[in-house]
Amino acid sequence: MRKVVVFAVSAVLLGAAVFFAVKKPSLFLSKASQTRPSFALKGDPDAYEKSTNQETLAGDHGEAEGGRLSAAEEEYQQRAYPADEIPFSLTQNAGAAFDQAVGRGQGANVGQWVLVGPSTATQPGILNFTGADTITSGRETALAIDPNCQVSFCRLWIAEAGGGIFRTDNALVASPTWKFVSGSFGTNAIGALTYDSKNGILYAGTGEPNASADSEAGVGIYKSSDGGDTWSLLSGSTSAFFGRSISSIVVDPLDANTLYVGSTRGVRGVSSVSSGGATTNPPVAAPFGLYKSIDGGATFTFIWNGNGSARGVNDVELDPSNHNIVYAAAFQQGVWRSTDGGATFAKIFSPIAPTYNTDRAEFAVTALPDGKTRMYVGDGAQGTPRAKFFRTDDAAAAAPAFVDLTTSGVANYCTGQCWYDNVVFTPPGYPDIVYVGGSYQYGEYGGISNSRGLVLSTNAGVAFIDVSWDASSDTTPAGLHPDHHAVVVAPFNPYIFFDGSDGGLMRSSGDFKNQSALCAARGLTGSRLTVCQGLLSRVPKKLYNLNKQLSTLQFQSLSLNAADPKNLMGGTQDNGTFEYSGSSVVWPQIIYGDGGQSGFSSGNPALRFNTFTGQASDVNFQNGDPTKWVIATGPIANSPEGSYFYPPVTADPNPTMAGTIFQGSQSVWRTQDWAGNQAYLEANCPEFTTAYNNPACGDFVQIGPAGATDLTAAGYGNRDGGYVAAIERAVSDTGTLWVATGTGRVFISKNADAADASSVTFIRLDSFALNAPGRFVSSIYVDPANPNHAWISYSGYNINTPAQPGHVFEVTYDPLAGTATWTNLDGGTGPMGDLPVTDLVRDDVTGNLYAATDFGVLTLPAGTTTWESAGTGLPRVEVAGLTIAPGARKLYAATHGRSAWVLQLP
């Protein structure tokens, strides 16, 4: 995948700037999880009842059942490969290696990283479920509100999955002012926020616990006594939680030194591509589970293993009437209770899907007027049985009796991804009020419900109303983003709720309007009409979008228009693909879904492509017009081959081959005319209404000898398995293609442009060099002056391939001798250390290399052996991809949580 704008070197191309796109983290998508959630058309509220295609539309508006969890395991496996585990010391050493490189300073004239946005990521109504224009930001994992919040001064903290912590003191205005407050953290992946208002202490647990492919691991717990202006790391939290993700922090209301902390498995790193096999979690680092501190976090004691959960403890609360009673939920294990401060535990609620390690129970406890404790529980996994909702009014009883309250208003509330988006919240002092959030009901919205993404009960869970859309318009209302993770309310009004989701933050007005009359207009009758009328009987009058100023998108990649270095596209986690045209404030969304890679044609920037998850990709012939995207990879998606979650894709950087796109699964697939005839594709394969695996949409074909196109097969020797992980074309000719797999195989083809796809041949190069690592290949950068010369980066750790250490190599293929050499560039006077690299680009003007890592960007100046910091000012954040424009002297970084940044090169 090209990540550079290159100025042509031949007479034919003299003066022409040619380019292609970068890459993004690519994760495995099993064949079983390739269907897409439904997408009803704007203006056709009953499309969910009429369409037969809705489960296979390309735009990925939800998490494929099982996909996010298996992908999370693959992100972990990417770092571990070829071993099964990542030892605790390696993740610590990687961070230390990065810090050492930064500590060496920076080279002359290397400047300051600048945020290029967006701070206002706009989504046009045509791409939104409700039809209303909106603004989005990155995934939020936790919220905390000051109980002294009033209309005139309301302090709210929000936690981002990869973007840190932001604070506002005017949370109740239409557009709050946000301040980033976690710049000193060792990671900006946040999983938990707890405000001890009695003592004025804010706790932040690092590492996201939501079991997604990019749920990044943390480094421990930070503490602030001034609202987040300054922080200190709890000394005992590093050994207990480094490399883990924190789900809950609970402070004993009678003893501020007593803390209970739940931890889960986390993922270290979002890279350009992802590994194949998933494994169980071995006992590395500190075990995940439930910990207790009695000295304010100076030390932590492991008190419960989640009864052997393979995922960890996802929820912890104390009984409101007895602080010695501890409730905890663990993946696949239901809800447990301790009556002796955590010394012993017993199960009180059994999971509904005990055979799935994806089963996740979320609960909330509240005090009843009679002194007893009520507990609400939402539980589900993936597939069947569908998610259910329960309540007991005496959680402290010897054997609590849970009543199944799974009515149509709350049934299947988190669909097939309860392990990812699942929240149950009851406001303190309002025991009959409960909010339940999960994912969109894609087959219902605009029909029997407004999606039921977030529902509210005011009668203790007996009945629910749908608060996912507001009443500001009957036709284009404001709505909540799918995938909900956190809810809090204004302390003086339990109906003013703040909702944190994959799309950022929304707030309700706190009052309601009856919109049940809309149900009949939707053509509903009988019981369906009755259900709809109940759900829409109290709809929020207004939902406020609070995402302005939040530059927290989780970019997977950035691509660049060769004709204009200020024109970018970038794919983001669950927020689609956005376009940058010079403004660091506003980037419009040009297509929805889980955005992966994107790119422009090297010959005509009006031709674009984007990828969703799996093998679903679109092309566009009309400058990215949101209504003109067409399905392009039907033949690939309809094939028996598997791929990574975001398969590698690259368009040919040579303008004479401007219609060619390559995409990797197990084979390399190719189109030579931008996926087919424009008129045919626009007439028969529009993105909004076409199944993503329609074999008639797109003309991609496998390249390579008949019967031997699969580059991961055993027929090519050792290191078999995995999928194609990296593809890169040489700009200086028309036929050289470099390809790598997730197991460390590296190939070169010298005739990838052959008209007869079956005549394309591949030569395996890694087998020529004893020092070529058998680890995950994260990127390839081809020398624009020599198609047989490239730089290759590797993920993983040297300890797993001790005879083949290294993360950055210079590789030269000698076609006459039939040999290839690998030169390790990690070492020297300033070694990189055992630091996985997520992406690599080269400044072809100076020869400097730039490496993206889990912690930031490093550079190796030409002619030196010293890796050092690439500029200053970039937050501590995982960098998923780099895109360079040597002629314009710009290096762009796609960060996974702090949006997009640029470094002006010397």
Where do the model's predicted regions map?
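Hydrophobic alpha-helical membrane-insertion segments, chiefly the h-region
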Residues: 13-24
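Beta-propeller blade termini and top-face loops
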Residues: 31-906
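N-terminal Sec-pathway targeting helices
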Residues: 1-11
